[in-house]
Structures are given as C-alpha cells and as structure tokens.
C-alpha cells in the first residue's frame, strides 16, 4: 500500500514542493514519516517505504505557506494522542484564533502551520465512540477559508474522511480499494473511475465503496 502512496506523490512532483510525508495505520497505531526536500529523501528515510506497515494511509507534498519548509511543518500532522492524522491543501484564514483557543485548552502544537489546528479540533470534538462523521462536521464548522482535507483515525481503521471547500479533491474508485488525491494525475495508474467532490461536500471512503455527504451530513450519493 505504501508503494502506491509514494508513487502517487511522485506523480505530483511537477507541481513543486519543499517537503513530503506519509502516514499509515498499522493496527491501532499511526506510523508517520516526513522529510524536507525531494521525495527521494522520504524514500531514503523509510528504506523505500518498507519501514511503513499498514493497509490504509495518506500522503502529502507541501509548498510552504504558513511556516518555513521544515520537517515539523511537513504534512501529515498528528494529534497529541496519536489518534488522528491529516493532510490539507488550502489556507485556514482563522487559524491563529483557533490556535490560541486550542492552546488555552492544553493542546500542544509542534508546527507553525495553519493545518495543525484541524487535527487538534478533531481531537477536541471526538468523543471516542467511533462517530467520525459528526466529529468532522463539527470541525469543519469552525474553519474559515479554503481547504481539501484527508483524515485518518486510528479508531476507525476501515474508513477515511475527506472534505472539500475551494480546493480540488478527487476520489479514485478501484476494485476492492479506493484512493483520493487533489490531482487526477496521482490516480490514473490505479483507476480511470473518479469522482470529483463539490465545494461543501465531505466523503467517507472505504475499501468497498464511498459515501458523499453535504455540509449537514446528509448523503448525496
């Protein structure tokens, strides 16, 4: 699985980036690897990805907006308790307000990015009952700005959630496996069957299918 993630990231190298990272869920543990510079640095750090074990995960290449091009600022970002990992494209306009609120509640930040507020909001709203959709909806309700988000939760190993507002996000539908990306280029070697999310939509993606919801949580298709 990690080979497909890394291959997808390599297909997006043409867009330019300053760091790369990958997170996979191995049982109930999220494994994380990040590196500055080219994807080959991430490959070297993980022995071509063989150090990563799992069957569900996400990856990202970052072009710095908020925060310098450092390993700490590279995506994915992980919650303090290790339950959530996320990647995001876009800009969260109210991130400083959210950051100050979360810090006041005791959440520890390890980066300068606007993205990290999202993973801590997920942690704050999650009740531990496996209801990831409600957690995501509450989190999205606090965000102002544009985003395309991928969310991995250690308590929900059979699903991932996606959310789009103003930035491209695409589901790739395979046979017994599904994918997501911000650019169809990362998907075409695995599937030609793709679904483009609309603004305000979120999606639950599983190996056996997917469900798209509107901003209220009502199924769309």
Residue ranges and their predicted role:
Residues 3-221:
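Conserved short alpha-helical segments that host acidic/polar catalytic motifs at enzyme active sites
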């Amino acid at each position: 699985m990690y080979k497909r993630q890394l291959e997808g990231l390599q297909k997006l190298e043409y867009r330019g980036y300053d760091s790369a990272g990958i997170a996979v869920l191995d049982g109930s543990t999220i494994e994380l690897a990040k590196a500055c510079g080219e994807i080959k640095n991430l490959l070297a750090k993980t022995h071509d990805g063989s150090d990563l074990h799992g069957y569900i995960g996400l990856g990202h290449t970052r072009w710095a907006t908020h925060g310098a091009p450092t390993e700490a600022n590279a995506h994915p970002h992980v919650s303090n308790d290790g339950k959530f990992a996320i990647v995001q494209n876009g800009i969260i306009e109210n991130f400083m307000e959210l950051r100050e609120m979360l810090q006041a509640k005791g959440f520890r930040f390890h980066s300068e990015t606007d993205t990290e507020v999202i993973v801590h909001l997920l942690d704050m709203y999650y009740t531990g009952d496996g209801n990831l959709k409600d957690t995501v909806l509450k989190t999205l309700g606090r965000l102002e700005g544009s985003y395309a988000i991928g969310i991995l939760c250690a308590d929900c190993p059979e699903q991932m959630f996606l959310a789009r507002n103003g930035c491209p996000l695409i589901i790739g539908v395979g046979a017994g496996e599904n994918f997501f990306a911000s650019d169809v280029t990362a998907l075409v070697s695995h599937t030609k069957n793709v679904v483009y999310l609309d603004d305000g939509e979120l999606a639950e993606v599983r190996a056996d299918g997917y469900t798209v919801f509107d901003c209220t949580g009502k199924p769309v298709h």
